[in-house]
Structures are given as C-alpha cells and as structure tokens.
C-alpha cells in the first residue's frame, strides 16, 4: 500500500474532463457473475507485480497494468496509454468535477454498466479494465464492416468513447441518409458538426438530438491518435 501511495503521489496533478459515454448497456446475471470474477482476479494481483521498475518505463509507470489488461481484452495497450495520458496524465487518484475517476476518467454510469462498485473505480487495475471493456463494447455496438480501415475504426470508437455512441450513430445514420459513407471518419466527423443545426438534428433518423460537443470530440480523436502514433514508435505491441 505504501509503495502504491508513493507512486501515485509522484505523478503530475493535471486533469482533463471526461465527457461521458452516452449509450446505456444492460448486463445479464450471467455476465454480471463473470464480471465479478474477472474483477476479483484483477484485485488479487498485487499492483506491485504489474508495475515495472522505473528504468523499464516505456510510456508510464502503469505500463505493466495497462499492457497486461489490454492484451487480455484484445486491445492495443499503446492506444489505452494514449487515452490515459489525455484523460489524467497518468494520475490514478483523481476525480473530476463531473465525477469521472482515475487513470481513464471512468464515469459512474460506466462502472454501473459493468457491475463495478463505485468505491473500486479508483483502483488502477479496475479502472483500466473498465476502459478496455468500454472500448470493446463500443466497437461491437458500432458493427463496422471488416473492410473499414483501421484509422477510421479507431477514430469512430474514440469519438464514441468521448462524445457518446448515440451521437456518433446519429451522424452515421445522417451520412447514410445523404448517400455518404457511414464508416468514414471524415464523413461522420462532418455530420457530428452538422448535428448542431436544426435541419440535421431534427431529421427523422436522429435519435439523440442536438450535439454541440463536436469541436471537443474531434480534438480528442486527433490528440489521442497523434499520441498513439508516438507511442507506437517507442513501444512494441
């Protein structure tokens, strides 16, 4: 506990606000039991066993935790690290004014979706696990075709993580209704911006109404992907 506390206190205290995930997912009793077991397994592994020695850091002191859990969940740990940098500057014990918590700035609604008690969200392993589960759930819900480019796929998933999958899905439906590619980030980004205007958010295909956060969401996607590119150059998957 002392080692964990010292590591936590040594990080920079800087916070970026996490704008929540708008979609609501339900969890069956079977899934809930599975999630409880997975969380318990994570919590039984000492944090010290997942933290590398200081001279072994590639990206952050949480390389071990982020890498181990991301690999288990089938995600690129360098992408998850880029998200963590943007969200918290790798600060594990912070809570934003909006209630987002920890390394990945997890909102209370996300913890509830995955049956995680709020008092456990600040635990780094649980926090990173929740972020991985959320990204996997988003990717599955978007149902992007196999031929979608990796860049478009990552951009759409990140936009959903930041601005809400409901608004991204609206933008994709608008693109489709106007005869454009709903799987192109360039196209979807444009319709996210247009969803601030009545002639678009009042369209019958729109389910989540007006969206005024497109500027923040587009900047988020660009920032995270730019940092991800840098991390890919210094660390292997």
Model feature map: region roles:
Residues 2-34, 73, 112, 116-126, ...:
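Non-catalytic cell-wall polysaccharide-engagement segments
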Residues 37-92, 125-128, 142-148, 236-237:
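Export/targeting segments at the very N-terminus of extracytoplasmic proteins
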Residues 57, 98-101, 122, 215:
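Residues at secondary-structure transition points
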Residues 63-64, 104-105, 109, 133:
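A generic alpha-helix surface/boundary motif
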Residues 79, 102, 153-156:
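Amphipathic alpha-helical recognition patches that constitute DNA-binding helices
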Residues 82, 105, 157-160:
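Soluble periplasmic/extracytoplasmic beta-strand elements of cell-envelope proteins
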Residues 87, 107-110, 165:
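Short, small-residue-rich loop/turn micro-motifs
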Residues 94-113, 177, 185:
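Short, surface-exposed glycine/acidic/tryptophan-bearing loops
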